[in-house]
Amino acid sequence: MAELTVEVRGSNGAFYKGFIKDVHEDSLTVVFENNWQPERQVPFNEVRLPPPPDIKKEISEGDEVEVYSRANDQEPCGWWLAKVRMMKGEFYVIEYAACDATYNEIVTFERLRPVNQNKTVKKNTFFKCTVDVPEDLREACANENAHKDFKKAVGACRIFYHPETTQLMILSASEATVKRVNILSDMHLRSIRTKLMLMSRNEEATKHLECTKQLAAAFHEEFVVREDLMGLAIGTHGSNIQQARKVPGVTAIELDEDTGTFRIYGESAEAVKKARGFLEFVEDFIQVPRNLVGKVIGKNGKVIQEIVDKSGVVRVRIEGDNENKLPREDGMVPFVFVGTKESIGNVQVLLEYHIAYLKEVEQLRMERLQIDEQLRQIGMGFRPSSTRGPEREKGYATDESTVSSVQGSRSYSGRGRGRRGPNYTSGYGTNSELSNPSETESERKDELSDWSLAGEDDRETRHQRDSRRRPGGRGRSVSGGRGRGGPRGGKSSISSVLKDPDSNPYSLLDNTESDQTADTDASESHHSTNRRRRSRRRRTDEDAVLMDGLTESDTASVNENGLDDSEKKPQRRNRSRRRRFRGQAEDRQPVTVADYISRAESQSRQRNLPRETLAKNKKEMAKDVIEEHGPSEKAINGPTSASGDEIPKLPRTLGEEKTKTLKEDSTQEAAVLNGVS
């Protein structure tokens, strides 16, 4: 403001020093030195500019001068007009012209100056221009030191900010200043903004430096978080950082985003450690045995989801076999978990416990399997049966062994087609051969020989017992079994022939005849039911075949009772059973060599009997036939046609071809009907 110094004329004629604050149309706003008078507007005709500072002081006697003096102690000093009366050395005697009375005073040379030649100011003496200030720069523009360089560049007398008009005021005594202000105003405001930003950063840096100095003496921790986990560490909208800052005792948390480094400062180590637990996210993996991966995951991921929920981890990932990012052991699969260090520790505890539990359960299961295997091996060697015990020493073809084998096949096999139980054997022997390994071969031969040589009465009694039990069975065959085949005990007689060639092979036919006799002795209702259920296919060696029926039809077309077969009612077949038999051609039991031998021998024996022998035993044979066939009974071998006629001659079966071959190759001894040579 020194450049805009003016002299304001007072009421007593003296000029007092003042400073221009604003320029108006016809006046100036002036502020007096030392504020001895309040700020006020002064007209142009009472204001003048001070003289140049480099003016020469040449004063002589009689010159008019201006003396720097004051009228009283309350007023400041001002320039008064006077005249030099006398000079003596450095002292001058002056006479004030403003006063009415003559007033003389001795003053020194420093208080004198030549009369100011400047006239009062006019409207064009001072130039004023304004610059609008943005809102963000108003506070900065209020400081006059911010315009120091701008003031010097434009040549302004004064630059200040007017808060009422929010403008920057530029006052100058030169018109060129206005042009320069218009050119440099934008640049000046931009520079102020840049300076303001730099100043604010410097202030923040200063504050940070002070805080750092204070925190350096306190507790702090520093850790690094991976770049891909930085989002989890910060949290949604910085929630994790805010939660860490709310921990009591935490003073500051700093984050370097470039390096992913967190710095936590606090008043205590516990507070700093607790805040670190909210921000430190890591990734770790746990090796899981490959055979337990499915059980660790659980059905629909239920087990692994429960582990994740209880531990607090963020996510879990199972590394595939094609990925080799993590080191893995043989037979192990890495489970990768992401979360805080605390949650990773929790999931390790849960997973290790669960794996130990699964291993223990697997070990118990393996022990159970070993025990079951040992039991299975022991059971294959010896299987005790409740129905057998004291009767083990009886023959193979007894009633008890037959019933036992049928019951055993029921308990182990299903009811479907072609299913055979574990007691089924395709050889010549029976189940008793497998279940009684302790018996010697000689004992078997003795038992078979005894059975084949047993009396006719004893055999008939046994077969009658068998025939009484057979009709009650649920199966389709004559025997009481549930499947298609007959009793397995029938095969023991075949095997006896093969194992003991010295015995009489024709004794097998007696069993068949005794079977037929036993069937005749049974009730008529049971017999008709069983005959209706029979099929044309031979079930076992004990059943009569179609060829046997044809052989008998050659000898006598009318049965022993004198009734023709055509007079009988046509047999009614079950359609469902007939459809059932069509698809069971593949389920036939295998035909063995013993079957061919027994069948061929029986047929050849009947055909090659001498006429004398047949005539001799005709009475006995007729007696047996009468006992076997009742008046209401149908033909034994093979069903009749619907019209009651006999079955027409069928093509030769495989048994007949076998019989023909045996006749040509070997000679057959003559035998009587009852098998006694």
From Swiss-Prot:
The modification N-acetylalanine is found at residue 2. The modification Omega-N-methylarginine is found at residues 476, 482, 484. GO terms for biological process: dentate gyrus development; membraneless organelle assembly; mRNA destabilization; muscle organ development; negative regulation of inflammatory response; negative regulation of long-term synaptic potentiation; negative regulation of mRNA catabolic process; negative regulation of translation. Changing residue 525 to A: Decreased phosphorylation by GSK3B. Residues 353-379 are annotated as: CC2 domain. Keywords: Acetylation, Cell projection, Cytoplasm, Developmental protein, Differentiation, Isopeptide bond, Methylation, Myogenesis, Nucleus, Phosphoprotein, Repeat, RNA-binding, Spermatogenesis, Synapse, Ubl conjugation. Changing residue 503 to A: Decreased phosphorylation by GSK3B. One of its GO terms (cellular component) is dendrite. The modification Phosphotyrosine is found at residue 68. There is a cross-link at residue 56 (Glycyl lysine isopeptide (Lys-Gly) (interchain with G-Cter in SUMO2)). Disordered region at the C-terminus undergoes liquid-liquid phase separation (LLPS) for the formation of a membraneless compartment that stores mRNAs. Belongs to the FMR1 family. This is RNA-binding protein FXR1. The lineage of its organism: Eukaryota, Metazoa, Chordata, Craniata, Vertebrata.
